[in-house]
């Protein structure tokens, strides 16, 4: 890559391909980290968006292909894989979700498989995809991050979508009055109407923080684990470029060991995100607080 020092190499790999308004007023791609920062809130991380859409299409294609090839006789390998995934998610929903909503299982399946695919890209050696993007564009200084879940914008986007569903179903099941009652009449209550009114601000503060903590914790948990995993891969890659045989050999061993362990992290983070989504939506469907 274009970065010459270890510090520059690491910073280069942690910078997204950013599109936004340049200092001269034109719209274009940032060529430095400073330019990307100056673009502000309305900048787009093109690599994050691109990989999210691409892997979403891959997910749909795989499951659509399996559905078209479904047979009543001996199933093929792809069909077996898809059936295992569907049964696993369906069992998780039945064990965790206590309401009645036919959309929860498809949503949980989408969340699990999509996030798993986004995480899975982290197993590709850190230089391969950025170098490929640089060769295709002819720009050796091109910023390019392939793991969308190491971008907090992606994980926040996912968690905010779940949060919107939580609020929507809370209001749909309990009504606007029931939803507001949950925020203002719990956890403290009193038979004295004056005391109850005085407790409303306290209850609202506590319940609002609890409500907002759901999407924030979802996003930061996924981002933090995947970002740390990517950073370790980058640090191991720095060892390869040290020019020292022992460090390079150690880097090979560490890379394989961390990749094997990281498979567990990749799967676990997708599973945790899915399960918490199911739990939060189950709570939204409960009539009582």
Curated annotation (Swiss-Prot):
<protein>
    <recommendedName>
        <fullName>ATP synthase subunit a</fullName>
    </recommendedName>
</protein>
<dbReference type="GO" id="GO:0045259">
    <property type="term" value="C:proton-transporting ATP synthase complex"/>
</dbReference>
<dbReference type="InterPro" id="IPR035908">
    <property type="entry name" value="F0_ATP_A_sf"/>
</dbReference>
<keyword id="KW-0066">ATP synthesis</keyword>
<keyword id="KW-0813">Transport</keyword>
<keyword id="KW-0812">Transmembrane</keyword>
<dbReference type="GO" id="GO:0005886">
    <property type="term" value="C:plasma membrane"/>
</dbReference>
<feature type="transmembrane region" description="Helical">
    <location>
        <begin position="193"/>
        <end position="213"/>
    </location>
</feature>
<dbReference type="InterPro" id="IPR000568">
    <property type="entry name" value="ATP_synth_F0_asu"/>
</dbReference>
<feature type="transmembrane region" description="Helical">
    <location>
        <begin position="259"/>
        <end position="279"/>
    </location>
</feature>
<keyword id="KW-0472">Membrane</keyword>
<keyword id="KW-0406">Ion transport</keyword>
<keyword id="KW-1003">Cell membrane</keyword>
<comment type="similarity">
    <text>Belongs to the ATPase A chain family.</text>
</comment>
<dbReference type="InterPro" id="IPR023011">
    <property type="entry name" value="ATP_synth_F0_asu_AS"/>
</dbReference>
<feature type="transmembrane region" description="Helical">
    <location>
        <begin position="43"/>
        <end position="63"/>
    </location>
</feature>
<feature type="transmembrane region" description="Helical">
    <location>
        <begin position="160"/>
        <end position="180"/>
    </location>
</feature>
<keyword id="KW-0375">Hydrogen ion transport</keyword>
<comment type="subunit">
    <text>F-type ATPases have 2 components, CF(1) - the catalytic core - and CF(0) - the membrane proton channel. CF(1) has five subunits: alpha(3), beta(3), gamma(1), delta(1), epsilon(1). CF(0) has three main subunits: a(1), b(2) and c(9-12). The alpha and beta chains form an alternating ring which encloses part of the gamma chain. CF(1) is attached to CF(0) by a central stalk formed by the gamma and epsilon chains, while a peripheral stalk is formed by the delta and b chains.</text>
</comment>
<keyword id="KW-1133">Transmembrane helix</keyword>
<feature type="transmembrane region" description="Helical">
    <location>
        <begin position="104"/>
        <end position="124"/>
    </location>
</feature>
<dbReference type="GO" id="GO:0046933">
    <property type="term" value="F:proton-transporting ATP synthase activity, rotational mechanism"/>
</dbReference>
<dbReference type="Pfam" id="PF00119">
    <property type="entry name" value="ATP-synt_A"/>
</dbReference>
<keyword id="KW-0997">Cell inner membrane</keyword>
<feature type="transmembrane region" description="Helical">
    <location>
        <begin position="232"/>
        <end position="252"/>
    </location>
</feature>
<comment type="function">
    <text>Key component of the proton channel; it plays a direct role in the translocation of protons across the membrane.</text>
</comment>
<dbReference type="GO" id="GO:0042777">
    <property type="term" value="P:proton motive force-driven plasma membrane ATP synthesis"/>
</dbReference>
<keyword id="KW-0138">CF(0)</keyword>
<dbReference type="InterPro" id="IPR045082">
    <property type="entry name" value="ATP_syn_F0_a_bact/chloroplast"/>
</dbReference>
């Amino acid at each position: 890559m274009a970065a010459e020092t270890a510090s520059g190499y690491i910073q280069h790999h942690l910078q997204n391909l950013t599109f936004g308004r340049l200092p001269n007023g034109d719209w274009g791609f940032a060529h430095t980290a400073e330019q990307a920062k100056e673009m502000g809130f309305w900048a787009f991380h093109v690599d994050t968006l691109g990989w999210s859409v691409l892997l979403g299409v891959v997910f749909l294609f795989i499951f659509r292909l399996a559905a078209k090839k479904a047979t009543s006789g001996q199933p093929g390998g792809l069909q077996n894989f898809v059936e295992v995934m569907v049964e696993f998610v369906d069992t998780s929903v039945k064990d965790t979700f206590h309401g009645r909503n036919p959309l929860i299982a498809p949503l949980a399946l989408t969340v699990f498989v999509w996030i798993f695919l986004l995480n899975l890209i982290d197993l590709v050696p850190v230089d391969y995809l950025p170098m490929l993007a640089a060769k295709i564009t002819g720009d050796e200084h091109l910023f390019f991050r392939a793991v969308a879940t190491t971008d907090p914008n992606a994980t926040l986007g996912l968690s905010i979508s779940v949060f919107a569903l939580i609020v929507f179903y809370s209001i749909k099941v309990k009504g606007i009055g029931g939803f507001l009652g949950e925020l203002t009449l719990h956890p403290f209550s009193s038979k004295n109407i004056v005391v109850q009114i005085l407790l409303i601000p306290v209850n609202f503060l506590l319940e609002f923080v609890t409500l907002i903590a759901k999407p924030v914790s979802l996003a930061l948990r996924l981002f933090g684990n995947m970002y740390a995993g990517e950073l370790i891969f980058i640090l191991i890659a720095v060892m390869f470029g040290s020019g020292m045989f022992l460090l390079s050999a150690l880097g090979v061993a560490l890379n394989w060991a961390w990749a094997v362990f990281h498979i567990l992290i990749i799967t676990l983070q997708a599973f945790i995100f899915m399960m918490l989504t199911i739990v939060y939506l189950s709570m939204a469907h409960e009539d009582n607080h």
